[in-house]
Amino acid sequence: MISGDTLVTDKIIELSDGADVVLHDAMALQLVQGAETLSRRSGNTRLATVLHDIQDYHATTADLARLADEADIGLLALYHLVPAPRNAMAIAAFNGDLPDGAVITEDGMVILLPANSDEIMVD
């Protein structure tokens, strides 16, 4: 199941249930809220507004953890990360709430589902 620019809703959970792989956008809420606050304080109201508005249509890592808990998913793979993590500390902000086995995708990553197998391979 592939989802993009959406919150985790009951319908997303329903559609994800039983999926081998769920690819979902993800937002590190604490980073976005921090950037929003700093933008507002520095007078950059346009950026602050954008950072506020994107919270309405990106799934938080806590909500994605709930998705993984409530739906039977083989692999939760996150893409379209907001904000795009540029270092290990930012990646850690995404990993904090995620269940074991969740994957933060990278450009060029391949997820393979071999025929006649339950195996999910990430390369």
Residue ranges, per PLM feature:
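Cap/insert and terminal regions of metallo-dependent hydrolase folds
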Residues: L7-G108
